[in-house]
UniProtKB/Swiss-Prot annotation:
One of its GO terms (cellular component) is cytoplasm. This is dTTP/UTP pyrophosphatase. It comes from Christiangramia forsetii (strain DSM 17595 / CGMCC 1.15422 / KT0803) (Gramella forsetii). GO terms for biological process: nucleotide metabolic process. InterPro entries: ITPase-like_fam, Maf-like. It is an enzyme of class 3 (hydrolase).
Length: 196
């Protein structure tokens, strides 16, 4: 649908996430992948979407001097927000187990911010989805972390994997946001940018 509008533009996706890359493929939006290292440090005073907004903009800053007129850069960040704490990606097995255990039997928010940057324009959007976990046993959590190694996933889990199939009883908001990108909002924003 956007192919005609995109013919004079190049979309750069600054994400190493295979899930985000697949979303763009499924949306039929061709992207150039360009991932640059960024130190994802934020002030402890930031809460919820303030964190993801800040990080998605921060990830764009390393590209600012290189962007050409016809390019649109997309950067994003996802966190799991539970009990007034942001959970990023677990650094090891023990931390993944601890994260999932803290989510068991409760609900939490998955917040994603997406930053669209061109040479003369920047827009940030964010989306929040509430996720409800059933009570999980220690054995189930151990099994999941051992077999699925969710170390590249915010909160230490992926909704589309085994743990989501057996443990998530309901969500309020976008499923795709929990996977890593509020696709409906990304599509809408790109369409608006390309039509302006």
């Amino acid at each position: 649908m956007l192919q005609e509008l995109l013919k004079n533009h190049e979309i750069i996706l600054a994400s190493g996430s295979p899930r985000r890359q697949k979303f763009f493929q499924d949306l039929e939006i061709p992207v150039k992948i360009d991932v640059r290292p960024v130190d994802e440090v934020f002030s402890e005073h930031l809460k919820k979407e303030e964190i993801t907004d800040f990080l998605s903009v921060l990830k764009s800053e390393v590209f600012l001097n290189d962007l050409k007129e016809n390019q649109i850069l997309i950067t994003s960040d996802t966190i799991v927000y539970n009990e007034a704490k942001a959970l990023g990606k677990p650094k090891d097995h023990a931390e993944a187990v601890k994260m999932i255990s803290s989510l068991s039997g409760k609900n939490h928010e998955v917040i994603t911010s997406v930053c669209f940057t061109s040479k003369n324009y920047q827009k940030v959007l964010n989306h929040s989805t509430r996720v409800y976990f059933s009570e999980l046993t220690e054995k189930e959590i151990e099994y999941y972390v051992t077999n699925f190694k969710p170390f590249d996933k915010a909160g230490g889990y992926a909704i589309q994997e085994w743990i989501g199939l057996i443990g998530i009883k309901k969500i309020e908001g976008s499923y795709f946001n929990v996977v890593g990108l509020p696709t409906h909002e990304v599509y809408k924003t790109l369409k608006e940018m390309l039509n302006s």
